[in-house]
Amino acid sequence: MKPTLLLNSGVAFSATSPLHYTLCWDNKYAHTGHCKEHHYLYILESDKEIVNDGHGKLKINYLDRLKERLSTMNEGWHLHKPKILTKDSEYVKFDGKDFYSKEVSIEKYIDYYLTHYNHIKNDYKAVADFSNLNACLSEKFMQSIKNELLKHFDIKVIMVFRDPVRRLWSVSNKNSPDPQNYIKMCVGGKLEPNCYYHDIIRRHRNVWGEENVHPIIMEEFWAGDTQPLADFLDFPFTKIHPNVYYPDMGSRAPHYPYLKDQWQSDKVDLDDETRDYCLDRLSYLYESFKDEYGRIPDMWMK
């Protein structure tokens, strides 16, 4: 029987860290190895094909930074993790130096997770890649690695989605001291790829099959609707990790341990005027999501 490789395909600022802790710490469904996010597949795709769209130099510089972080196993100061999910974990029993280098290949990726699985298989059901940039992988690239991955793994894909406006507000808080103007700039221009939930779902379904892709609605999952994910993974949950983003408390959110990446992002509260401004101009995102997913979650657009 092949081991299961769980691919989490974002999205950032939608509680991927609490989801990571729920599956990999609190319940021991899967283990991610040396770190949560190495962005290996994104680096591999970008390394093979730098798209020259007028921002080619910027993308190369970004790729260089990702490679440097990969080679030093550095996730960033704001992504401090519990020991069990770091390179110092009792479950990480190899150095991974061949994988954590600037020279990347799909063969190294496969070997890394097969090696890790053999070390954890008595305690965990699967291995996992929780790199948020998996959400940005192109359909063409995923098709190019699909057969090789399926030779060695059963692939399951999850992705967690938060109300688009509230998520974009957290992004704006993180990226600018003036989030009101920043979010209006985003709404009036080209949005980041993470905003297009429908496209993320469609690309992954087209490659891995709808039966192997499970979108999670953040607000619903943390409100208690956990059984659909448990059924998808064929694994019962005994605990759901706390989530700074639910219930949404804005700047008054609790400072839970190991979730600084969440509570540092909402320093200014979303006011009604800004929310309504964004909802009016981003209604197409909600409608596109409905077309792909089948409905707009009741807790969105509030």
Model-predicted regions and their roles:
Residues 1-124, 130-131, 208, 235-288:
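PAPS-dependent sulfotransferase catalytic core
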Residues 2-12, 17-24, 28-30, 39, ...:
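A generic "structured core" feature
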Residues 28-29, 37-38, 46-47, 54-57, ...:
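PAPS-dependent sulfotransferase catalytic domain
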Residues 95-100, 129-135, 180-192, 265-274:
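Surface-exposed cleft-lining segments at the edges of enzyme active sites
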Residues 105, 109-116, 141, 197-201, ...:
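Alpha-helical packing segments of well-folded alpha/beta enzyme cores
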